[in-house]
């Protein structure tokens, strides 16, 4: 069986954790999938360091080594690194890439994500809500409806992935007429660590010291 070749576009928080999850389940995935490329605007040394040392999950168990200016190895995996802003310039087709894991947060509509398809990839999985995606998948709710006709696929939001499985079961067993929900979210990279200016005065508060009401894109 020929392995499906995967590229990660955007090696921030989500991109790195997707890669770590892939490494943790290497025995399950190595026969069918290979993460071969990472595209990110940060330099390779910074990305290697951030992958190796994680404040939440700890140091990477696998050995990681830089190979030249544009490659690194993790265990038995060798990854080529690029730094392109425009997916068209990545020429995924020439690289033999089948699936893009779109983790930048920038290409969050089908129109934008299709740039990867125009570049030669076959599928795009967006790690966020995606406007007009062919399919938005939530594991445990509708994952069995995913099919090969879906080209741009959204993995939904963190809130949706938390709420939907619970609501699905409650609605199936008892029925939901209407409802109201709130989400309590850990602070993220766009929340300031100190008090500072923000057009939303609630968001101007230091993340670690305040409970900050805000909206959600879920």
Each language-model region and where it sits:
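Short, intrinsically disordered, charge-balanced linker/junction segments flanking boundaries
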Residues: 211-218
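N-terminal Rossmann-like NAD(P) cofactor-binding subdomain of oxidoreductases
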Residues: 2-204
């Amino acid at each position: 069986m020929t392995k499906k070749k995967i590229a990660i576009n955007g090696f921030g928080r989500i991109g790195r954790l997707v890669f770590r999850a892939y490494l943790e389940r290497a025995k399950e995935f190595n026969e069918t999938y290979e993460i071969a490329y990472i595209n990110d605007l940060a330099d390779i040394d910074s990305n290697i360091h951030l992958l190796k040392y994680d404040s939440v999950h700890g140091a990477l168990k696998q050995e990681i080594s830089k190979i030249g200016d544009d490659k690194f190895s993790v265990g038995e995996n060798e990854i080529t690194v690029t730094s392109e802003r425009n997916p068209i310039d990545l020429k995924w087709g020439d690289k033999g890439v089948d699936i893009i894991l779109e983790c930048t947060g920038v290409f969050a509509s089908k129109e934008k994500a299709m740039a990867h398809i125009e570049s030669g990839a076959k599928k795009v999985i967006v790690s966020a809500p995606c406007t007009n995606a062919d399919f938005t998948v939530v594991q445990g709710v509708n994952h069995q409806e995913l099919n090969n006709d879906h080209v741009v696929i959204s993995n939904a939001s963190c809130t949706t992935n938390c709420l939907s499985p619970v609501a699905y079961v409650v609605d199936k067993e008892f029925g939901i007429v209407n409802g109201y929900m709130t989400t309590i979210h850990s602070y993220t990279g766009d929340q300031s660590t100190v008090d500072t200016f923000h057009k939303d005065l609630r968001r101007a508060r230091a993340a670690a010291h305040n409970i900050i009401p805000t909206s959600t894109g879920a």
